[in-house]
């Protein structure tokens, strides 16, 4: 299984509603995509205070690297990704992505 982890530093003027809309779109995409198992996204509520500016994150589990590739190339993912970048501090530099083979 591939665990796709995305952290974002949302701009201070980005509303929680806007972020929820982006996350809802990603969740709907995952629900309709073969090989994608689950979407979980939320603002950070960590008591450790080690976020280093990252305010929100989401995780998607995929059956395989091929399923992750299909997701990455999907037009809806690209559109939602562009919205996420537009609402991140310093654009793409405000987003961190890591994929784990678990």
What are these regions (language model features)?
Residues 1-55, 63-73, 94-102:
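Short S/T/G/P-rich N-terminal loop/turn motif that feeds into the first structured element of a domain
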Residues 27-30, 76-82, 88:
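A common structural junction motif
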Residues 50-51, 86-88:
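Short secondary-structure boundary/capping segments
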